Amino acid sequence: NHNLNMMLRNGGTMYVDAGKPAPGLIEQTVANLKEISPTIYFNVPRGYEMLLPYLEKDEELRQSLFADLDILFYAAAALTQNAWERLEKQSEATIGKRVMMVAGWGATETAPDCTHVYWPIERAGVIGLPIPGTELKLVPNEEKMEIRVRGPNVTPGYWKRDDLTEAAFDEDGFYCIGDAAKFADNNEPRKGIIFDGRVSENFKLSTGTWVFVGSLRTRVV
């Protein structure tokens, strides 16, 4: 609903890619991008990572993708800084400037937006600031800060599952989404927040050291 309604609101045209970020399927995405020059391009981080080797060696693909492009958007997972910088390099080499890269954060239960980046940023991982009408609360959870969200976009609960609904909301009515975040700049909250993995997937080693899976996954990839 986010992408469709944004397109309708601005009188645009929406193209649905039949390709996927998987071996044997990313080639369809490459072929599609040679036919269509988007003004806004949406993909998940894995999609960009699989697309990059083609962009780096295929001039026709680069020219088609960047010709009219205003925004590269990603969500659903963390984009690595390496992929961010490689995308910037291809943009600069093709059209002489960096295309604005932005991200958002949310879940199905939040319909789906909670935060958005709406200004130029210089690094991967920033998920922006709360959208109008939405409140975020950062709650200490072990050694991280858990994000909780409240607003008109948040589901009132799970159909016929009062047990799940009760467990999903805190005493202030904030939805406990299970993700973690931190400020991009502790002294300047307006610079946005950074996605910091999940709080529920972390575990402790026998040495007593916490392993933060989200951060580890980003570094390994």
Across the structure, where does each feature detected by a protein language model lie?
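Conserved short alpha-helical elements in the N-terminal third of ANL/AMP-binding
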Residues: N1-Y15, A31-K34, T39
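Short, solvent-exposed loop/turn segments at the edges of secondary structure
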Residues: H2, M7-R9, A67, I131, ...
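Short, surface-exposed basic-aromatic patches at helix termini and helix-loop junctions that form
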Residues: M6-R9, K89-T94, A167, V221
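Conserved adenylate-forming
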Residues: G19-E143
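Conserved ATP-binding/catalytic segment of the ANL
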Residues: P140, M145-L205
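Phosphate/diphosphate-binding loops
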Residues: S215
